[in-house]
Swiss-Prot record:
<keyword id="KW-0030">Aminoacyl-tRNA synthetase</keyword>
<feature type="binding site">
    <location>
        <position position="238"/>
    </location>
    <ligand>
        <name>ATP</name>
    </ligand>
</feature>
<keyword id="KW-0694">RNA-binding</keyword>
<dbReference type="GO" id="GO:0006437">
    <property type="term" value="P:tyrosyl-tRNA aminoacylation"/>
</dbReference>
<keyword id="KW-0963">Cytoplasm</keyword>
<dbReference type="InterPro" id="IPR001412">
    <property type="entry name" value="aa-tRNA-synth_I_CS"/>
</dbReference>
<dbReference type="InterPro" id="IPR014729">
    <property type="entry name" value="Rossmann-like_a/b/a_fold"/>
</dbReference>
<feature type="short sequence motif" description="'HIGH' region">
    <location>
        <begin position="42"/>
        <end position="51"/>
    </location>
</feature>
<dbReference type="InterPro" id="IPR036986">
    <property type="entry name" value="S4_RNA-bd_sf"/>
</dbReference>
<dbReference type="InterPro" id="IPR002307">
    <property type="entry name" value="Tyr-tRNA-ligase"/>
</dbReference>
<feature type="binding site">
    <location>
        <position position="175"/>
    </location>
    <ligand>
        <name>L-tyrosine</name>
    </ligand>
</feature>
<keyword id="KW-0547">Nucleotide-binding</keyword>
<dbReference type="InterPro" id="IPR024107">
    <property type="entry name" value="Tyr-tRNA-ligase_bac_1"/>
</dbReference>
<protein>
    <recommendedName>
        <fullName>Tyrosine--tRNA ligase</fullName>
        <ecNumber>6.1.1.1</ecNumber>
    </recommendedName>
</protein>
<feature type="domain" description="S4 RNA-binding">
    <location>
        <begin position="357"/>
        <end position="414"/>
    </location>
</feature>
<dbReference type="GO" id="GO:0005524">
    <property type="term" value="F:ATP binding"/>
</dbReference>
<feature type="short sequence motif" description="'KMSKS' region">
    <location>
        <begin position="235"/>
        <end position="239"/>
    </location>
</feature>
Amino acid sequence: MASSNLIKQLQERGLVAQVTDEDALAERLAQGPVALYCGFDPTADSLHLGHLVPLLCLKRFQQAGHKPVALVGGATGLIGDPSFKAAERKLNTEETVQEWVAKIRKQVAPFLDFDCGENSAIAANNYDWFGSMNVLTFLRDIGKHFSVNQMINKEAVKQRLNRDDQGISFTEFSYNLLQGYDFACLNKLHGVALQIGGSDQWGNITSGIDLTRRLHQNQVFGLTVPLITKADGTKFGKTEGGAVWLDPKKTSPYKFYQFWINTADADVYRFLKFFTFMDIEEINALEEEDKNSGKAPRAQYVLAEQVTRLVHGEEGLVAAKRITECLFSGSLSALSEADFEQLAQDGVPMVEMEKGADLMQALVDAELQPSRGQARKTIASNAVTINGEKQSDPEYIFNDEDRLFGRYTLLRRGKKNYCLICWK
């Protein structure tokens, strides 16, 4: 992405929700490398899909020659951002937040290049400047620059202020000052001139721009990326099991890959623009090809492949594709023990059973059939496989050969109903 028309290119991808003084920012970016930052608060022990668009945006700026600063909020994570939240967040302990800071820092690192000369990325933690600040300094040096009148008129907190049942604590109300000071601080420390974030962060970003101007007399900018929505109106980045996480221990690479494979046709080309580094021309050509092929679209496979590789690397992608292929074909011989661990984690429904169980009981325990009677009929009708092999004997009792790697047996009823038995 050439720097001179970077904003235009981001707009073509649908990646710009709001931007302050667009012409001045475009001019500033055209003059040479700019330091920019995005903040990630440790509200859990992993980032999730909602964080991916701003994180990839940092990467897009770095690829265009700019210097990204990834800020993990060791201090702001202790307070909690009230922006567009219906209720007060639960406060986490300092130990928990510090632990999460370390994990999120590690997660962010592979997306950016920390060793590429002039525009090498920087990792920052706002606990470094807030941890030792006393309350008088905070109120005198930061608080006096903020107008409460303006703060209560910010859209992000308006809904909370108007609700009798919830309201907002002084703790969360002060969050805006903390994030505002982050921008001013990073401007002084690293010359940061641009903050990016999700569109829910607009109020916090504009506060930071204002504070930086007041404290350092510098012009700085803000740009937000849209919060991702799906064409059908349902929430993006959620499955029945909850959020889709970037940590493979919380969402396996197989489940992650499947999430993208299941993208609706109405969303997939937009998501290719948001979540991949493919050229717009390439994405448009793929859309055209899918429209005219008369076959199932290829776009979902391209999207799943690109994003899984970005987040889980080549190894994670290869494993996810291998598991997908084996489940589709019914032949499990290529699956490794680690693949079965992914399936047990969240890939297919899982049930633990004692050795000596029979097939009918397994189908009932696995919720593949409601009763032993129904299970008997299903087995007799040749609709059940054990590890890919058909089994039509209703009295069948599992043996050691059925226990792959000593503990896994994959049951299938019909074409698509799976359950993994983990033997105790």
